[in-house]
Amino acid sequence: VELGQVEIIASRSSVKTDAEGTTYRISMQGLPPKAKAVLALKRLPGVITRMEVFSLIGARGSATIYVDEVPVDPKFLSTLEAADIDRVEVRYMDHNSSGEGGAIYIYRKKAEHPVLKGDLDLSGGLLRPSWRLTPSLTLYSRAVDIIANASATYSHQSPEFHIYRNDHPELSIYNRAKVLQTGGQVFATAELTPRLRGTLTYAHFGLQSWHNSQVKQQGMVTSGKIRENQMRHAVNLLLAYKLGSNNRLLLKSYGSWMLGNDTDLRGMVDRINSRDVLAEIAYEHNEASLLGLTHRLGVGFGGRLGRNSLYDGFAPYRNRQLRAYVRDNVSLLEDLSLYFILTGQWGEYGRDRLYSYSTFTPSLSLSYELGGYTIGLRYGHSVQHPSADLLSPRVFYRNELEQRQGNPHLGPQYTDNWALSLSKQFGRHSLSLKSTYWHASDLITSVYTNQPNVLTYGNAGIGDELSTTLNYSTALLSNQLSLNLYVGATYADYRLAPSYRARALSYGTRGWSLEWGGSVNYYHPKGWLANLDLSADGLSRSLSHQQEEEPQLMLLLQKSFFAGKLDVSIEVSAPFGWGERMTETTFLPGIIQRKEIRISQSNVSLGLTYHFGGEAKRPMKALTTSPLSLDDVKRSDL
């Protein structure tokens, strides 16, 4: 299907639909020659952009981003060029990703001749002191590809917090902060043999902040300094060995290490030392014949070890898990596709006492093509185990009215998710409608039990959410104008579990909320680019709170000079302070608590980006160890 800005492609020309996901090839027409992947993904139907965070229509949470099947930080998309992308797969169900946000898989092209190129990006704030420096370098060759970047961001911020109880001011916090964020990523891919390909990634993230804080409560003023330090390292390794033209063996490993410490106004220091290691082996067969049908099969087995020390005087949190899965994608008919995942997990977690578990979580997706419409039905069951900070019995101090205490006896949370979708492509337009029902039992949530100043955690709730989202995308003016818009409504009902009704102060929340927004891009061939991102998500609810945020807006205007070698840009974030405020309301017996938060986002930034390096001498081809090679991909008969 040709949509102008993207083209829907399929692995088998005889199949009209795929229950696993949709594969797109993105056109460079209407994009700047040096456009990055983050701009290209905004063209995909069913993909929602919220301030350069990508999510899928109707999904809970953000989508996990993969490049050549290795997970990357979304900021990596600002380094990868759109012209280097072969295709993009959008999957609402993914066996590699945790959570319920789905995944976006990006597969790169392979250069036949060496290419060395890069960028140097520098920007500074005009209204508030801030600057950002981001150099990047890309090397493509026959043997190895390397994409590397580094970043440093510095800003002055002035967040404020005000707490009211029954409309009476109780506490105010004023901060004057200096924040330094650093980061770097290296993405390396090597053709070790004609059949063996390896991909190694390393990422570093650092945060340092210095706060001069002032607290006003009941006529008393307390001043002091707060310091925050965080550092995280993450490594991914993927080895893919092609056994034949349609089957391969995968070895995946992941490791992360995080260190951090926070100092509060009392001089107390909270420290964390977290380590996580994962390894998995998988086998995939893309053309297996069984019962007269062609299957795309996959099986995998792996293990995970985690250790988290909070330095709170208690034993470290430990997590050990074995995981196995089987998945199958089969076309039952020319216009009917089935995809399912069955995952088994066995493990234990806890601090002094380890809790053992064994779970099986099925996921199922059906896709049916009827008269040009694609109808999808999905079901997923998942189990969520509590994290280390929720299990610590120590009281973590934020201020006199906001203290949090973990619960070492927390159990798992069980969720079920049903989704019904309808999509249609006509001309250069795409329309998608998706309705979802989400149910959670033994909900892991914050709850007030003994006093309104201390929030603890428990399997205290039952949650239900019913939502419907409509997405419309199109390309106009020879693809120069791109629109991707969404609007949705959600009814949420969070209520106390029977075991907590007699002893909890929280009431639960329920009601409707509306979300809308999208992305609009215009590119003129003479080098002008305009991009507008708008996100208005209205109310969000949990068992103890309801939260309302102002709409967020970001506007970018860019002009290219010297044959596209230099870009000059102006970026406007949260104009006139619109989007800086958030209100959190809590309902307790005899108390309505309202917390107003204002963060520092409003700014106008001037940026310069210098592009250097050459292009490939010949057209790029797809990487050979991807599940679908460029030679195997054919246009769908849709």
Locations of the language-model features?
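Periplasmic plug
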Residues: 48-93
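N-terminal periplasmic accessory domains that precede
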Residues: 1, 37-40, 55, 75, ...
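Short, acidic, small-residue-rich periplasmic hinge/interaction motif at the N-terminus
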Residues: 1-30, 51, 92-94, 101-103, ...
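Outer-membrane beta-barrel translocator/receptor signature
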Residues: 98-104, 112-160, 179-184
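Gram-negative outer-membrane beta-barrel transporters
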Residues: 437-439, 458-540
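Transmembrane beta-strands of outer-membrane beta-barrel pores
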Residues: 122-126, 141, 152-156, 202-208, ...
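Face-selective signature of the C-terminal outer-membrane beta-barrel domain
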Residues: 183-207, 226-369, 374-375, 430-437, ...
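Outer-membrane beta-barrel signature, preferentially recognizing the C-terminal barrel domain
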Residues: 373, 383-432, 437-441, 454-477, ...
